[in-house]
From Swiss-Prot:
Keyword Coiled coil: no
This protein's name: Baseplate hub assembly protein gp28
Function: Baseplate hub assembly chaperone involved in the tail assembly.
Subunit architecture: The gp27 and gp28 proteins seem to combine to form a small hub precursor during morphogenesis.
A Pfam family that the UniProt record links to this protein: Phage_hub_GP28
Record InterPro entries: Phage_T4_Gp28
Protein's organism: Enterobacteria phage T4
Keyword Acyltransferase: no
UniProt keyword annotations, A-Z: Late protein, Viral release from host cell, Viral tail assembly
Gene that encodes the chain: 28
GO biological process, one term: viral tail assembly
């Protein structure tokens, strides 16, 4: 007996690359991918790569939110204090370019599971260039507002709220649980 099952798919367009991705209902294929015991980081990477390989960290978070919603782990809409939040309003808020004293600092997005010891370590390792030249910058000697740069680089997703955007994948998942 040959069963040709067609699993439902949800189509989403990735905000950075404008690539259309099909979000699947989790099934036996995904169980087989995750059945071997691995770390949560590695399991998530395998799962997301099976859906769409080579995504940026912000796109991984975006696909993860829609994967959770489509598989019934979080709600797609939620009303809190008279304001309705909708999963389709989630957007990428990551900033990778900053201005200071006439210079433009360009950063790469940190890897999805990349770890750093300190904020200055993160900024130093993610710095691509200043203006058009590669430079070593000691971020400890810069003003304290570079901490906000680190937060803007590391925060990938946001959703509009009545009192300003709610940022971070953890906060957004918590909102829709």
């Amino acid at each position: 007996m040959n069963l040709n099952l067609i699993l439902p798919l949800k189509k989403v367009v990735l905000p950075i690359s404008n690539k259309e991705v099909s979000i699947p209902k989790m099934g036996l294929k995904h169980y087989n991918i995750l059945k071997d015991v691995k770390g949560p980081d590695e399991n998530l990477k395998l799962l997301i790569d099976s859906i769409c390989p080579n995504l940026s960290p912000a796109e991984v978070d975006f696909v993860s939110i829609h994967l959770l919603e489509f598989n019934g782990k979080i709600k797609s809409r939620k009303e809190i204090d008279g304001y309705t939040y909708d999963i389709n309003d989630v957007y990428v808020c990551q900033r990778l370019e900053f201005q200071y004293q006439g210079n433009t600092f360009y950063f790469r997005p940190p890897g999805k599971f990349e770890q750093f010891l300190t904020v200055s370590d993160m900024l130093s390792k993610c710095l691509l260039r200043v203006n058009d030249e590669v430079k070593e910058i000691n971020f400890l000697e810069m003003p304290a507002f570079v901490l906000k740069w680190a937060n803007d680089i590391f925060t990938t997703l946001a959703i509009p709220g009545p009192n300003g955007p709610i940022t971070g994948i953890g906060n957004i998942i918590g909102l829709f649980e």
